Amino acid sequence: MVQIKILVNCALPYANGPLHIGHIAGAYLGADVFVRYNRLMGNQVLYVSGSDEYGTPITVRAEKEGRSPKEIADIYYEEHLRTFENLGISFDIFMRTTWPEHSENAQDFFIKLLNEGYIEKGTMIAPFCRKIGRFMPDRYIEGTCPYCHYPKARGDQCDNCGRTLDPQDLIDPKCILSGETPEFRETEHFFLRLDLLEDRLKSWISSKNFWKPNVLAYTQNFISGGLKKRPITRDIDWGVKIPLDGYDSKRIYVWFEALIGYITGAKEYSKRTGNPDLWKEYYMDPEVRNYYFIGKDNIPFHAIIWPAMLMGYGGFNLPYDIPANEYLTFKGQQFSKSRGIGYSVDDLLKAVPADYLRYYVASILPETGDSDFSLEELVNTVNSDLIDKYGNLVYRILSFMDRYSINPDPVDVSGDEEFKYAQRSFELWSEDLSGVHVKRGLLRWLDLAIYANGFFNRSEPWKTIKNDRQKLNHDLYLSLKITEVLTVMVYPYIPSSAEKIWNMLGIPFAIGQSYRHLYEMHAFSVHRGAIPFEKIDLESLVSKLNN
């Protein structure tokens, strides 16, 4: 098997509030499963995310709480790190856009694109709140979306239909701080000339027929009406400074500089590992595929604006795939902690183990359309799949062996129909995950788990122990080999539990090395232990969430 290098960039969450399970389903769980799969296969992966700390969502929260934006960013940077860690998501580096190194990288991009003619100075109309006496950033303006008529659309984007907006596009716009209708006044800013890169972008997008249909359609629709120059600076004082004289009251806007955070993260990781040029291998070697895991609302920034910035700068790999997910809803509504819709990740982790949550969310990932989160379905899915099918299989095999003090000798089962079925399941699962079909890969695993239970039942070891020890040895060994394959396949989804079961099976190599040895007929040194699954019930789950 040829090993390859892969760069996985995961959307930078705003450091302005807790992560809810909609965030995890949108970008982070799928990315983590994909990264763990590739590492199982022996591929080298650089896994980067970070904290988006210069956005107006941070300043909005800071003003509401009477804190500085940096205080808010510090609080949620640490909280997000803990949440990801508790959920078993571990990035190689989780950068911060407030790092000085990031400002340097963003300013370098700004100057290079300016010198190449892809950034120009101009004027724009911006909302000015007379009551407060200053220009207001886009996010400080809310109103009705002119496209879908959602009443809480922001001045930069409608979260309901996903369209990017300008504040003056809104119907009945209001300043969120004063409640006043803003005036629209002229102000000087810098613009990214997306129009100059439109033909190159269209040509590049035409080669992406393997993208998810929803992502490709969204991108093609976005660009079909023609691209316009887009402002990349704002009248704010919280952000990366414009590296030119005379613009002290303006900053580079977040949607431009935050994208550069992926490169900042890769550079910082390279420095920390003692190889400062390592990042270039991931960004400049055309053989390295770059994946960007994001939510639906980030598609235009990653499929249009970021590639345009990379094209304008020159020398960088463009995104290979952008497997953006749709929305995970709660009772048909988008998750919103502030509006009391749904649950934060931390709330749920107090009520259920991380692997239970990972498994259920993976089973309902909104990969090509919205899906709905349900506590009832969480309970049913975990109990039915993880416990009744997988956990029960492991328990029955190991308890039988323990009861009769049996540890089967290795035997060649490579020609057996059941082992060939497991091999084919693994190959299809591998195709699914290499193509970022995370939910489909889980269904492959579940199918094999059902098949493995059926084989164990048909083999009837409780009978062959009495009259056919050779068949007993063969069938038990075959059940162990299929369970080994099952455990490798489920590891990217529930890593902690899978590793515990792996150790119980007594397999003579680490699960991370399994791709090299999976079809070897090695010995098992089985030792029975507590199966890492317990059934959950809805009543106790709700009680824990409410306490």
UniProtKB/Swiss-Prot annotation:
Recorded hits in SUPFAM superfamilies, A to Z, give: Anticodon-binding domain of a subclass of class I aminoacyl-tRNA synthetases, Methionyl-tRNA synthetase (MetRS), Zn-domain, Nucleotidylyl transferase
Q: Which residues bind ATP?
A: K337
Cellular component GO terms, alphabetical: cytosol
Q: How is the cofactor bound?
A: Binds 1 zinc ion per subunit.
**Protein's name in the database:** Methionine--tRNA ligase
Residues at which Zn(2+) binds? C145, C148, C158, C161
Q: What is the lineage of its organism?
A: Archaea, Methanobacteriati, Thermoplasmatota, Thermoplasmata, Thermoplasmatales
Q: Where in the cell is it found?
A: Cytoplasm
Highest taxon, organism lineage:
Archaea
Q: Where is this motif: 'KMSKS' region?
A: 334-338
A biological process (GO) annotation for this entry? Answer: methionyl-tRNA aminoacylation
The cofactor named in the record is:
Zn(2+)
